[in-house]
Swiss-Prot record:
The RGD motif is not positioned at the apex of a tight turn, making it unlikely to interact with the integrin. One of its GO terms (cellular component) is extracellular region. Belongs to the CRISP family. This is Hookworm platelet inhibitor 1. Its main location: secreted. It comes from Ancylostoma caninum. Disulfide bonds join 24-65, 78-146, 141-154, 174-186, 177-195. Monomer. It is found in: Secreted. SUPFAM superfamilies: PR-1-like (SSF55797).
Amino acid sequence: MSSYLLVLVAILGFAYAEGDYSLCQQREKLDDDMREMFTELHNGYRAAFARNYKTSKMRTMVYDCTLEEKAYKSAEKCSEEPSSEEENVDVFSAATLNIPLEAGNSWWSEIFELRGKVYNKNGKTSNIANMVWDSHDKLGCAVVDCSGKTHVVCQYGPEAKGDGKTIYEEGAPCSRCSDYGAGVTCDDDWQNLLCIGH
């Protein structure tokens, strides 16, 4: 666990981006600071992945209130299984001080199972695939109590994931941002490792 904390400290040192998370419904277990932390955590991991795996068009993620609503509908079912391909689920049996960090580290730990850049739904990499799918540029998360356990769900968009599909394209980081269209450029807030814009 301590190695994950060191990695997190290193990747969150990349950048701090301002965001307006106040447009989402206010929740008992999820505030704007947590929304921001989920977003920055994902972008930090994506930047580290882009650097180490040489991804050519990894997008910066932004927080999305519509995806948060979908995540809450799923989380309130208290299932420990994802309801869709574009969903990560984590369940804690004990109280944790930092829910985004705990869930993010759990999902990120699948990096050690990742073999190549093609997604295999029978592998143990569904969560990491969602975190680093290069065309995902939105996320929304939910935190709910279910019979004394904390359920964390994050939904990702746009839909892209599928068995046999490519998780990321190789190449120099940011070298293919323009594949997403005019106006998509390299994000210097993330050391020119992630693409930003729509």
